[in-house]
């Protein structure tokens, strides 16, 4: 490819909504352009990187025995209503009607459709297992699309589905896919960690996420320093913390004028925040839920949602608080009257506390000397707090560490949730009917590209892993005015026939400094410079983007050296 012909219009000024580095660099390097909020057009450089990720995915998923198919993006509402997810997806689902008034959606995922599809022609145990996948666009009406390809409304995804006779068969398929995902992300040159995950709206009884480790990640990843435990923070039940304080005093109301936050109250009462109880009030579908955690803890909202089986999770409104007899800033379960569609739940650690302080449900007043197990009355008790850095590992008792990650893939053991709802059954060798046991397996293709940039960049631009770099090599003639320099660059370019589709010749009529700057921005793994040194000594300069290492070799040996370097980069997945 000649750089003069490459369609990659660079930007000098970036839009204000370009916050993360992948978004900034993909816009600046002319890799994509925003069409609407959350939707992007992929220009040649981004398209090539995306296609390379797809190629790796296909190679590894095909090894598992899965077969590629392609399913419709437009899906009828009926199949979603059978599983109950027409309502569950809520406003995130793009919904539309045809001219006859029939309801459809733009596919956010394909569990319903693939289950319906497989059930049409699969009825016997002799036809199982079935393993299929596709790579295509998905659509989710994100409330706040942001971070470029990290959270967009239209994105490219690989989604796979397996159908088995029993749990044992599913376990085998799950292991095959888990191992394939490990190979895929390794080949993409990513530093990642598989973690235990919550199944979310898709459902199922087991799930793992594959998280790319990056400071810009939206996910909090919990792992243990002493064992191999790792999980998304939302999927962890932390251990209950015992209380070593003993108190027999009766609870007492004290004046706390203007003290309406945990920090303010604890400072006013000269109390440790660990001896306070925090109240957070949610609206879970139609039910107002008062959640109580220790003052230094946060509520695990995903766990809370799962406990109540809620579709929508919002903060309670002022009207909700008033209806339930709650005074904002001074809330507690003590003395509350029973109200319809109102529930109280306390974290297990709270129920271990003694001599605590909490709200009194009156403005400017709090309780002290509270023993929640004694004073809170009939409340629901469960583990609803979020695990924190330094907590005890729930598996081995070691120390918990929390880092940031970008989810690029997830695997699920779905079980029979969809097959039962949609009638996907088979007959065993005795003629008895059973629901198929399903698994599903997703990879965010465009998100993988963005995550790679988040993990691999510096102040000058992108540092692509060679396997997914749009091009692997750029040849830069540093002196455009010299015909012999240009001729030498073209001859080297022509000689790279084994890598003809992976080499760019920067033949633009630009200064060498601009070419070098663009090469670093775009992130070519290898740059070959032919200039004054070649004219003076016959040597050319090879520079590695990742390490910054520069190697001088005779012109005649350049091709062989570049091929050697590329082979080494591929072998090391760098």
Where are these regions (language model features)?
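TRNA-binding/sensing appendages of the translation machinery
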Residues: 1-98, 161-200, 297
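Extended, low-hydrophobicity, polar/charged segments
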Residues: 54, 111-119, 144-160, 168-441, ...
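Short acidic loop-to-helix transition motifs that present clustered carboxylates
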Residues: 75-79, 320-321, 507-514
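Acidic, His- and aromatic-enriched active-site or binding-groove loops in soluble protein domains
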Residues: 87-104, 212-223
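C-terminal, non-catalytic macromolecule-binding modules
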Residues: 265, 439-468, 472
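Generic long, charged, amphipathic alpha-helical segments
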Residues: 461-515
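C-terminal structured "cap/appendage" subdomains that terminate the fold
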Residues: 492-561
């Amino acid at each position: 490819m000649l750089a003069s012909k490459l369609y990659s219009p660079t930007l000098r000024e970036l839009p204000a909504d370009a916050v993360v580095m992948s978004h900034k660099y993909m816009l600046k390097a002319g890799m994509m352009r925003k069409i609407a909020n959350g939707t992007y057009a992929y220009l040649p450089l981004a398209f090539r990187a995306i296609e390379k990720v797809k190629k790796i995915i296909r190679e590894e998923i095909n090894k598992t025995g899965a077969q590629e198919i392609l399913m419709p993006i437009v899906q009828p509402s009926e199949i979603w209503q059978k599983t109950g997810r027409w309502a569950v997806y809520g406003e995130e689902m793009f919904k539309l009607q045809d001219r006859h008034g029939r309801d459809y959606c733009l596919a956010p995922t394909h569990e319903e459709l693939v289950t319906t599809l497989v059930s049409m022609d699969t009825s016997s145990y002799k036809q199982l297992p079935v393993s299929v996948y596709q790579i295509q666009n998905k659509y989710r009406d994100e409330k706040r699309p942001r971070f470029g390809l990290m959270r967009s409304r239209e994105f490219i995804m690989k989604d796979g589905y397996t159908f088995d006779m029993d749990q044992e068969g599913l376990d085998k398929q799950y292991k095959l896919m888990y191992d394939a995902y490990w190979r895929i992300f390794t080949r993409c040159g990513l530093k990642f960690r598989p973690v235990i995950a919550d199944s979310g709206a898709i459902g199922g009884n087991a799930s793992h996420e594959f998280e790319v480790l990056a400071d810009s990640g939206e996910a909090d990843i919990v792992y243990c320093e002493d064992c191999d435990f790792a999980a998304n923070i939302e999927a962890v039940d932390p251990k209950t913390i015992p209380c070593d304080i003993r108190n027999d005093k009766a609870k007492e109301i004290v004046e706390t004028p203007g003290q309406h936050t945990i920090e303010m109250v604890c400072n006013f009462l000269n109390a440790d925040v660990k001896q306070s109880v925090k109240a957070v009030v949610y609206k879970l579908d139609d039910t107002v839920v008062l959640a109580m955690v220790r003052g230094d803890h946060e509520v695990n909202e995903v766990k809370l949602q799962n406990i109540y089986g809620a579709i929508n999770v919002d903060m309670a409104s002022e009207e909700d608080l008033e209806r339930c007899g709650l005074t904002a800033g001074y809330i507690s379960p003590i003395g509350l009257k029973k109200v319809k569609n109102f529930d109280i739940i306390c974290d297990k650690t709270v129920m271990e506390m003694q001599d605590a302080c909490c709200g009194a449900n009156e403005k400017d007043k709090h309780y002290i000397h509270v023993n929640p197990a004694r004073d809170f009355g009939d409340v629901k008790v469960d583990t609803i707090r979020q695990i924190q850095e330094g907590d005890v590992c729930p598996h081995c008792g070691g120390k918990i560490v929390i880092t940031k990650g970008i989810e690029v893939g997830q695997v699920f053991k779905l079980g029979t949730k969809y097959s039962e709802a949609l009638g996907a059954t088979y007959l065993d060798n005795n003629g008895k009917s059973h629901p198929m046991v399903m698994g599903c397996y997703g990879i965010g293709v465009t998100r993988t590209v963005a995550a790679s940039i988040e993990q691999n960049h510096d102040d000058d631009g992108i540092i692509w892993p060679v396997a997914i770099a749009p091009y692997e090599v750029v040849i830069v003639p540093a002196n455009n005015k010299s015909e012999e320099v240009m001729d030498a660059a073209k001859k080297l370019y022509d000689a790279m026939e084994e890598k003809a589709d992976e080499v760019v010749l920067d033949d633009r009529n630009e200064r060498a400094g601009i070419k070098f700057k663009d090469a670093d921005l775009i992130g070519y793994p290898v740059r070959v410079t032919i200039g004054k040194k070649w004219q003076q000594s016959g040597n050319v300069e090879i520079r590695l983007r990742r390490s910054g290492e520069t190697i001088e070799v005779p012109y005649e040996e350049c091709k062989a050296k570049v091929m050697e370097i590329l082979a080494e980069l591929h072998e090391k997945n760098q």
